[in-house]
């Protein structure tokens, strides 16, 4: 795949197909594109906005090149947010995971280091002394005994690791903020998802119906004296 052709098409306001965005991820994981081209791609997508099929294709590529996390329990939930709302809130989804697990419902939390915020889920978990692992025995022991397991994105998704430094340098949200909640390697059937704005909520509603996940969206600007929109 020629990234030059992709970028030229984007300059002409053309949409990419699901297969094309999947192949972009495959190319990223095989180091086919220089950082400058990946930076241009992420910037262009952020300025134009990503389509449902483009997002699904990126998701397909990440899952195809990633490592699955097979958990030996029937039902569990992921509580996750896109980040990038620029409001410098605390880690709402990460905190919620411990509340839910404490209430007795199993949680498979997927997260990463901060790219566009002060602190990501992995920053919080690591600073509390948890060692990241992709060892399935340890992961299953964690969810069995503690009711919660943490899945660090860069251990399971090659593309996330490749684009990490680029995202950090850009300092604004990219399509990978949207992808994080869609590529949990354990593929939970239930998810509570926090989004940065209402446009993202509508986008996820279309995406989730195509991949058949039982989920609830909430707008992450949560405050005590006011209500927050929820999409079920």
Task: Go through each PLM region and give its residues.
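A glycine-rich phosphate/pyrophosphate-binding beta-strand-loop-alpha-helix module
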Residues: 42, 90-146
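Acidic, glycine/proline-rich low-complexity segments that act as flexible tails and inter-domain linkers
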Residues: 1-88, 103
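Gly/Ser/Thr-rich active-site loops/lids in small-molecule metabolic enzymes
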Residues: 193-213
């Amino acid at each position: 795949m020629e990234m030059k052709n992709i970028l030229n098409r984007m300059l002409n306001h053309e949409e990419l197909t699901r297969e094309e965005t999947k192949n972009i991820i495959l190319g990223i994981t095989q180091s086919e594109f220089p950082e400058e081209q990946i930076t241009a791609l992420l910037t262009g997508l952020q300025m134009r906005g990503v389509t449902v099929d483009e997002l699904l294709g990126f998701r397909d590529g990440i899952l195809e090149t990633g490592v699955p996390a097979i958990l030996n329990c029937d039902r569990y939930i992921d509580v996750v947010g896109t980040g990038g709302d620029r409001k410098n809130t605390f880690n709402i989804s990460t905190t919620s995971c411990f509340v839910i697990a404490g209430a007795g419902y199993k949680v498979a939390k997927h997260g990463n280091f901060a790219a566009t915020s002060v602190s990501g889920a992995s920053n919080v978990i690591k600073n509390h002394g948890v060692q990241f692992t992709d060892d399935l025995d340890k992961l299953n022991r964690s969810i069995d005994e503690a009711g919660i397991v943490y899945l660090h994105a860069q251990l399971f998704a090659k593309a996330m690791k490749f684009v990490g430094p680029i995202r950090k340098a850009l300092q604004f949200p990219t399509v990978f903020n949207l992808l994080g909640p869609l590529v949990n390697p354990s593929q939970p059937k239930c998810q509570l998802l926090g989004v940065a704005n209402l446009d993202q909520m509508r986008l996820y509603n279309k995406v989730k119906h195509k991949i058949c996940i039982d989920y609830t969206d909430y707008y992450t600007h949560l405050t005590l004296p006011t209500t927050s929109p929820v999409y079920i």
